[in-house]
Amino acid sequence: PMWVRRTLTWMSLHAPDLRVPHGLAPARISHDRAVVKAYRSDPLVRRRMTGRLARFVDEGGRESLREADLLPCRTLLMVAGDDSIVAAEGSRQFAQRAPAQLLTLRWYDTAWHEIFNETAPISDPVYADLDEWLARTAQALSLPPVLTPSAQEAGTP
């Protein structure tokens, strides 16, 4: 929301190191309740942010969009389509501006923020897409096959 952006801009200029609650809703990071519970009890999770950090994130996102056409390497962009933590639409905008021959976009309509820590019906296609992209990219670059944890568990190359 615009009021949040204005508040964080003011903070970054007048109180850049003041830590305030970020207001992110942990209940919406994953459909898997165990993941949410682990997140809530993790002492390393920071529940506050500074105006300086907010400005850095905002400016970094804008710069990424401005310079998307300069993407120098093959990239797999995997997006949670129902993400309430970050604006998924920004990823779509980035993909539209990046060189099409270098960027592969995979969009998961019902996924929340933690696409690799979702329930199986949601995360299975995520891991399958990653496995496929890594194999295709390794083959194109004449590299030996790469096994992700999900491919190793399945016993597939």
Where are these regions (language model features)?
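Alpha/beta-hydrolase-fold enzymes
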Residues: 1-50
